[in-house]
């Protein structure tokens, strides 16, 4: 048996303004070429835009959006006997949240327009209202899992 102590789990840092780990996760996914200050600036502009448009706390809108986009199940490709099956698997909450953030930012990037701050603010507001591309992606994933429920025993 090893005598060394186990390493302490690294906790995610929270952002300077909202002191929220979810915001920090979003910034880290938004990050390009190591330009974190730019990512923070984009996200804070988006939050300001949300506050102006909805007159609500932007953090609660963000939480609501992530909650609405977070999937419970996903499909994984599993090769059995020469054919590939889409096998539905349950997702742990942390992985679901990471997927939701990825989908939200992907949908924001695909929106028409110039400013990423504007595009992401509109996508977050849409997701909080339960519509938008990211929510459609989640529903599509759930439909795929439902359609391939017969292959669940291949896990």
Swiss-Prot record:
It comes from Angiopteris evecta (Mule's foot fern). Its main location: plastid. Belongs to the universal ribosomal protein uS7 family. Part of the 30S ribosomal subunit. PROSITE patterns: RIBOSOMAL_S7. Keywords: Chloroplast, Plastid, Ribonucleoprotein, Ribosomal protein, RNA-binding, rRNA-binding. The keyword Magnesium does not apply. One of its GO terms (biological process) is translation. HAMAP family: Ribosomal_uS7_B. GO terms for cellular component: chloroplast; small ribosomal subunit. It is found in: Plastid, Chloroplast. One of the primary rRNA binding proteins, it binds directly to 16S rRNA where it nucleates assembly of the head domain of the 30S subunit. GO terms for molecular function: rRNA binding; structural constituent of ribosome. This is Small ribosomal subunit protein uS7cz/uS7cy. Pfam families: Ribosomal_S7. InterPro entries: Ribosomal_uS7 (IPR000235), Ribosomal_uS7_bac/org-type (IPR005717), Ribosomal_uS7_CS (IPR020606), Ribosomal_uS7_dom (IPR023798), Ribosomal_uS7_dom_sf (IPR036823). The keyword Zinc does not apply.
């Amino acid at each position: 048996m090893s005598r060394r102590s186990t390493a302490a789990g690294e906790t995610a840092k929270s952002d300077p303004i909202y002191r929220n780990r979810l915001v920090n996760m979003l910034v880290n996914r938004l990050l390009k070429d190591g330009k974190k200050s730019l990512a923070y600036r984009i996200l804070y502009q988006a939050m300001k835009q949300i506050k102006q448009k909805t007159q609500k706390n932007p953090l609660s809108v963000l939480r609501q959006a992530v909650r609405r986009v977070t999937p419970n199940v996903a499909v994984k490709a599993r090769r059995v006997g020469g054919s590939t099956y889409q096998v539905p698997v349950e997702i742990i909450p942390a992985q679901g949240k990471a997927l939701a953030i990825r989908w939200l930012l992907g949908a924001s990037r695909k929106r028409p327009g110039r400013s990423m701050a504007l595009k992401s603010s509109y996508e977050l507001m849409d997701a909080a209202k339960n519509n938008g591309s990211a929510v459609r992606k989640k529903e599509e994933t759930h439909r795929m899992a439902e359609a391939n429920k017969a292959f669940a025993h291949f896990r």
